[in-house]
């Protein structure tokens, strides 16, 4: 999974990126300190994987990972080349979802590119640049389809119709993900890789004083209302606090520090949970003496396709899957005990994978 972190300059974007990835990239108090997109890969914490590793003592343990891309601060006119321009809009296209950091704190010592803290205005500035970029993409798509029609290929008529309606929607400043369309046509639109079609998590970057009671902040509530209206998620985070937590290496010291501050879970954990929920993702596990590993798949994935995540041969030659739920495995203590109780199931090609399944795939090629 790849998440692109966007936002106006000086909203706490790079500070948050540093905190969740421990990458130590510049987070200076001026616009465009992020010259190129910084990339950090973080492990997805999973207590189930930890337990399996303690049981099997494997040669290696491989958690699921999330790739975070810190994309340079966008400004008005980015879609037309202002600031750092189109290059950085193109970096967003390669991501699975967008993490939009919004400044929801007041601090006269930290410059705001627009001069004041108004979260919805800031969101509109970013979204408008994404919309403008999408308009260009859709116009090119329509032009290409119309040329194909003139060449005698009538199957593009419906494509022209759908994208023309979408263009009207975008020209009103609306996001592609709010375009009301059938599932079939939405799948067609998805082939165009539009920025405003991507699912979005808004990160409300708040002060230390407000982050534990976000509902008391009018800035946060404004962002939450917007997120709810478009089916997005919003997470209250204090990037500065996350940076302080990230500097502590000792787990016990970190836990004590978080408890003192009343922080129940880290911003990274919040982001991971929100991204899995928003993108409809689950994890299954494989375990043995060589390796214990967590694999990320979409909800609704069937066993052969899940096997294909490990190796294409597993999917091509799929025979069956030996499956046990993690909770059953943990309750039994060992695989032998689980088999003795009949808790290990044999599942075929139509089996839909569940979160926490421990699986052994049988295949033949």
Model-identified regions with their sequence ranges:
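C-terminal-of-GTPase-core extension/linker across diverse P-loop GTPases
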Residues: 2-6, 17, 144-352, 359-365
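Conserved Switch II/interswitch segment of TRAFAC-class P-loop GTPases
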Residues: 40-45, 72-82, 93-156, 169-182, ...
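Amphipathic alpha-helical transducer elements in NTP-driven molecular machines
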Residues: 32, 46-49, 62-68, 82-96, ...
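Conserved G1/Walker A P-loop phosphate-binding module
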Residues: 1-111, 139-140, 144-145
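Glycine-rich, flexible loop/turn motifs
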Residues: 23-31, 38-40, 48-51, 80, ...
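Generic signal for short, ordered secondary-structure residues
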Residues: 14, 31, 67, 105, ...
């Amino acid at each position: 999974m790849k998440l692109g972190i966007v936002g106006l300059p000086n909203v706490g974007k790079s500070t948050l990126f540093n905190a969740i990835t421990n990458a130590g990239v510049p987070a200076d108090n001026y616009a465009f300190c992020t010259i190129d997109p910084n990339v950090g890969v973080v492990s997805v914490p999973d207590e189930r994987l930890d337990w399996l590793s303690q049981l099997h003592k494997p040669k290696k343990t491989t958690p699921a990972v999330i790739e975070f891309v810190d994309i340079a601060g966008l400004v008005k006119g980015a879609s037309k080349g202002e600031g750092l321009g189109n290059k950085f809009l193109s970096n967003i296209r390669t991501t699975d979802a967008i993490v939009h950091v919004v400044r929801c704190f007041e601090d006269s010592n930290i410059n705001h590119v627009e001069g004041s803290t108004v979260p919805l205005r800031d969101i509109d500035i970013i979204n408008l640049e994404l919309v403008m970029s999408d308009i260009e993409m859709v116009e090119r798509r329509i032009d290409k389809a119309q040329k194909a029609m003139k060449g005698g290929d009538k199957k593009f008529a419906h494509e022209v119709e759908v994208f023309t309606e979408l263009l009207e929607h975008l020209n009103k400043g609306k996001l592609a993900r709010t375009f009301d369309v059938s599932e079939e046509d939405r799948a067609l639109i998805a082939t165009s890789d539009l920025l405003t079609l991507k699912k979005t998590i808004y990160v409300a970057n708040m002060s230390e004083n407000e982050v534990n009671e976000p509902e008391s902040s009018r800035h946060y509530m404004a962002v939450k209302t917007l997120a709810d209206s478009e089916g997005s998620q919003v997470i209250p985070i204090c990037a500065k606090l996350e940076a302080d937590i990230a500097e502590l290496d000792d787990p016990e010291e970190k836990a004590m520090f978080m408890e003192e501050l009343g922080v129940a879970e880290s911003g990274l954990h919040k982001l991971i949970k929100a991204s899995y929920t928003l993108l409809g993702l689950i994890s299954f596990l494989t375990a043995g003496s060589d390796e214990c590993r967590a694999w990320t798949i979409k909800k609704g994935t069937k066993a052969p396709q899940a096997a294909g995540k490990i190796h294409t041969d597993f999917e091509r030659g799929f025979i069956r899957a030996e499956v046990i739920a993690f909770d059953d495995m943990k309750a039994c203590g060992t695989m032998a005990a689980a088999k003795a109780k009949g808790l290990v199931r044999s599942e075929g090609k139509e089996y839909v994978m569940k979160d926490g399944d421990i699986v052994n795939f049988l295949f033949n090629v």
